[in-house]
Amino acid sequence: MERNLNSLLKWSIENSVPSSAPAANGTNGTNGTTAVTTHSSDSNNTSTTPADAPSQTNGTSAAAANSKLNPEILSALFGGPSEAELMKAAMEVLTDKSATLDNQLIAFDNFEQLIESLDNANNLEPLKLWAPLLGLLAHDEAEMRRMAAWCVGTAVQNNARTQERLLAEGGLPILVGLATKEGEDVAVRRKAIYALSSAVRNCQPAMDAATAELSAHGKGDKVDAGDMDAVDGVIEWLRGEGERCVNGVKTFYDVGIGYQRRREERG
């Protein structure tokens, strides 16, 4: 809010009309502007024009040169909801068990767009939105889990502060669990891996927490979070594990279908 007020003050100063200057030598005492007298061929016909009158030929108004108010400042000025309030409102819909899935997915889409802003992502902590967001990773609906993982990945991408917060909130084990869980929806796995990739890069504590969880899956070697090739190796391994699980489920399904068809053929 303070930032918006400062921006509003700056805008008002830039767009204010300067007061008339006091009369001085060479100025018209009534309006404080220098007068230029022009003479036509008729010696009795003279006209006086302010020297600082705006040009009619440059085609650019003074207002166009002034800075504009961004939507957030306009919302604050006219009483609209702030982005922080929109984030809280979206989370209320996401955690409302009476809300329809369609409305919750719309709220998730809006929430994800809001936290693309670094300031809004950082506000997840003071707004106490981390806990409910991570809680949605365990939602019954796969699409809700997918969107929750997507939002986590967006919030921590290239942001040391939110990476640390995710670690403190216990989000790393949850994401590793989603990325490695047998039978998990493919789209959910992919977004969980995306979130892990964003969470561990250049954040050694998060990388250590992730590899500690992955040790149960045979991938617990120490990895330098600043070595992008090494981090990519872990992420690619996770993707490979996901594909292996998907292929395993598909094979099991194909075998089952084949068995059923053979039984039908035998009559």
From Swiss-Prot:
Biased composition (Low complexity): 23-49
Pfam families in alphabetical order: Fes1
Keywords noted in UniProt: Cytoplasm, Repeat, Translation regulation
GO cellular component, one term: endoplasmic reticulum
Places the protein is found: Cytoplasm
Signal peptide: none
GO biological process, one term: regulation of translation
Gene Ontology molecular-function annotations: adenyl-nucleotide exchange factor activity
Domain of life of the source: Eukaryota
ARM repeats mapped onto the chain: 58-99, 118-157, 160-201
Record has Cytoplasm as a keyword: yes
Biased composition annotated in UniProt, kind: Polar residues: 54-63
Keyword Acetylation applies: no
Function of the protein: Functions as a nucleotide exchange factor (NEF) for Hsp70 chaperones which accelerates the release of ADP. Required for fully efficient Hsp70-mediated folding of proteins.
Family: Belongs to the FES1 family.
UniProt name for this protein: Hsp70 nucleotide exchange factor FES1
Organism: Chaetomium globosum (strain ATCC 6205 / CBS 148.51 / DSM 1962 / NBRC 6347 / NRRL 1970) (Soil fungus)
Gene: FES1
